[in-house]
Amino acid sequence: MSKQDGKLTGLFGAPVSDRENSMTAGPRGPLLMQDIYFLEQMSHFDREVIPERRMHAKGSGAFGTFTVTNDITQYTSAKMFSEVGKQTEMFARFSTVSGERGAADAERDIRGFALKFYTEDGNWDLVGNNTPVFFFRDPKLFVSLNRAVKRDPRTNMRSAQNNWDFWTGLPEALHQVTILMSDRGIPKDLRHMHGFGSHTYSMYNDKGERVWVKYHFRTQQGIENLTDEEAANVIATDRDSSQRDLFNAIENGDYPKWKMYIQVMTEEQARNHKDNPFDLTKVWYHGDYPLIEVGEFELNRNPNNYFQDVEQAAFAPTNIVPGLDYSPDKMLQGRLFPYGDAQRYRLGVNHWQIPVNQPKGVGIENLCPFSRDGQMRILDDNQGGGPHYYPNNQGVYDSQPEFKKPPFPADGDGYEYNQRQDDDNYFEQPGKLFRLQSDEAKERIFTNTANAMDGVTEDVKRRHIRHCYKADPDYGKGVAKALGIDINSIDLEGEQDETYENFKN
């Protein structure tokens, strides 16, 4: 029987005799427990909502195709980049970061930019954002960021005080905060923004030579943003504005595209780099490490079912393929465990069997035979009766030494090193970013900052003004004026930076 026959059954195939009237004792009597269809419907309904993502809960996604447009085989042996013109299927999910599933799309917030490439050597997940940097550089602060931007435990409301108290306790956050308070803090929609891998990653070629890389994805639709006032009007009329724009564009054949670029740094250049090249709060200047074109991806197919493909999409930085690798970036290293662990909690240990997460280029039957059982193991015959241990005398499931990675550079004693003794250059790059803005754009940064700090205590405002001033005096003066604070009343030249370790208000 097909869906087109229009005949209703229960979940196990039994025909449903009446969809509108419950089984009762008499026409007005109580319900009977033997109304199995009613019980089945309600029990399923009670359980159909899965945990939302702790961050990036509100998202939109689409399928597409990545095409190589430039030869980078000198840097990587990854098969998806093996020849110009080669195409790889992919899935993309964009998101806001702070809000819940029902949050408005046009909020001032970072956007998640997560890509899943179905390569012939397995899935490659690049889990990035629409900004090239982040608020901090040590992953021990991840949980506190979540707390600061989410709801207050007492009021259950999002708190600008908590947000800014956290940000201003970290002088290295100013770079990301400056981007967030700039015009690019509210993209008009998902099609008109850039994406970044943000972290430093690495590539290695067939000779075992490693280079450090950063990934960039430049929208081919152009950059378009919203002011605070425009965003408020959008939210008032359509809380799903970005999701609607992406879905409708693809549905109408207006397929969005992004060009992929990399920046490349050799190991020798990294050793001599002015700053820590693995610091997520800093960028590599394009003049020193120019963008190298790699390819282009196009999103050209909407999911048939949002829950099936977007809500159940699972991304993890640990999903990587031969020719691509990690770096000493502490923030990247700190993400390697929790992403997969969160998916196992949210979707189950066998979430890799969900269609959107399946490694299409490899084949389910060829996947790890030693990971078995678990809830909802529904594909691949649970690896059948073959050996589920190694070594075994059947000569199957041997290692593949030809895919060994080149040695990963690491040295030093295990210790909780003070990051601030290693690098306290917090303000150079946000200062340069500020000076790149037009006079009108600078004024909008001041206004946006004042709007975002509404309700924040004066000590926190002063702390932020001090950081802005150290990046550029005009930056500090402009923010102070917008906040209505006399800048001459602030100690602007204090030698001790105000970190969470040493607040001087």
Curated annotation (Swiss-Prot):
Chain spans, region Disordered: 1-25
E.C. no: 1.11.1.6
Keyword terms, alphabetized: Heme, Hydrogen peroxide, Iron, Metal-binding, Oxidoreductase, Peroxidase
Cited Pfam families: Catalase, Catalase-rel
Stored Gene3D superfamilies: Catalase core domain
Binding-site list for heme: 339
Name the UniProt record assigns to this protein: Catalase
Gene Ontology cellular component list: cytoplasm
GO terms, molecular function: catalase activity; heme binding; metal ion binding
Naturally occurring in which organism (per UniProt): Staphylococcus warneri
InterPro entries referenced in this protein's UniProt entry, alphabetically: Catalase (IPR018028), Catalase_3 (IPR040333), Catalase_AS (IPR024708), Catalase_clade1/3 (IPR024711), Catalase_core (IPR011614), Catalase_haem_BS (IPR002226), Catalase_immune_responsive (IPR010582), Catalase_sf (IPR020835)
GO biological process entries: hydrogen peroxide catabolic process; response to hydrogen peroxide
